[in-house]
């Protein structure tokens, strides 16, 4: 019934077509019995690598298990195809910048690129057997997703959780957009710590160490610790900034670290978050000398020129009033920098170039005391890798800081798998210092459903789109009752996380029970049962999703969250195109097949990074081959699609294998209910190799072939083989869907092994404690016999004239049925239970002593 060799390419093609046609994975909207999975939508950002398969397989193991358990599984796939990652891919593909081609043309280019990338993802997911219901596919830039994302924003704004404000934010000078705190990564760079001479009005020299001397023109104060005896006499005096000659106050603040640098710190607007804190706490002026391109712009020292408002629709003198930021107006002009002769030297330079130039000027003027080479951590944009600047601009924010306690309660209410990952989220939430900036100065994203009024008497008023009219594009559409001349459309787009943070709601087609699309299914699938994702986006995707569900419905978005680790390259680093360490999935799939790739993915524990290992693929291939060969052997003793009956299983060792299998079903079911797929596979695999193949198939062979005269024992063997293999296939099915389907079809049924309610139930088996203990004793004795033969270079098949066994306890002696199988598998003419033995070929394990009488001549 089974071919000589398993041809994975033919089988995979066959069942991919069959599964799609039969809709075996389709959700049937069965209320009350649905298991909903919030699937991570892959980002459309570049070429695929083996890591893309890694965690998606983990989710599929659970989806297939739950389906076989009897659940109506809601298993969608989405594509996160809007936002900065997609824009960067398009810019790289066409070797252009978004602003060079214009909004409309660039958006067209984005749609072209994402369509091709989506097809590549689809082919990959199908080729590895991911059991999505493709009719539930969604896209974060689709009309429905944009409508829901805009609904989410409107709901948050109306509830007071979304707001717009001019304030210092993290700015990416490469992608020219604001970014959120969660999109930062710390990188270590080589730099220099420069000790610079300032002066006081009394002409007293003071020394300040800094890694950013290019910010000297932005210096607005000098700080010392109030208890630093070296500098207490300076508090309240005026410092003269090196090179620029600007006069700034010397202020005491306990956030200064006495043991860092010289103990004196210059506050520049803005070098880091501490500068923001000091500027706002002490009411200092702002001197913004870096523009949105990452260049020195001394003309913009007031922070009010057009370049600082570029891309936001806001400029000085526009009809939209400036919001109250609590920032004191400038008292200095930029004249000191001009007068000091550095204006022409550094104006227009990139930050790094300006730093080098300033150091040269300081050296020439004798104001650089010391320059020490150091390595230090710099905050960079996660996407572009560029060092970030802090610039004051108008942005949209979602409140996070005032709801930290409530969000932490939600985090603790959710079940985390593994539990250790919950702590990672708690640490992140507790350490938050910024509200979530959700606006981006880009093109390809969800537009804010907002206009700003120019109508007389309501200048600057925010006009929200009506929910029933969503989705809208404020650049093309008008608010009800307003003319084009009376409004300014908001030109920003939402952070891509602002949309992907509502993936449970995108699947439900509603933001909450009161706000959704007409055809919503919110009451059927929200909250979801499971969110699966990798650990590096806990602080983004997991956090933002919990936050939004809390705001929209005071609910968890899902009951369980399952966290995968990374698939690391051979160099133990995360796979990435830029590092040149990616492994193409298509090559691996062509070499080993989908089941082996899935086996590799299943051999990683939740939350643990796994180094790519070719050896695991080889082990997986060996397992697939063994499963095929074992099935071929069993097929010799059964009719195709024969009925299975446990009632005719009568022999001790047959009951032993059933009892072992009973415990495996119990363990693997519990493992998978806790999302521990790795532990489940390990238990199945151990049973298959050790109990079934190494021991049971060997001991039952002769009885199955009918060598024995006992027809009842022969029938017991055949039924046991067919029965056990059937359950083995169903246990392996979530992990190895192709080979199990083929064997199941050929031997057992035309129905799919993956059908609902086809997971093995331990009630299908008989647990016989006596037979299990008897069988375990049997295996111990068999292993001792094998050891003696191996140690003495005697063939396993070599005839034993007499097998003598001493049991430490009389009750451990085998019964007639088991002893008969032992005699067959050991090829022994006689088995004798003895009180003592002095044979030459002997070994023992504490429970049994075994000796052999063999003619080796």
Language-model regions: role of each:
Residues 175, 244, 384-385, 454-459, ...:
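Short Cys/His-rich metal-coordination motifs, predominantly Zn2+-binding knuckles/fingers
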Residues 31-39, 61, 94-98, 122-129, ...:
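Active-site-adjacent bridging/hinge elements
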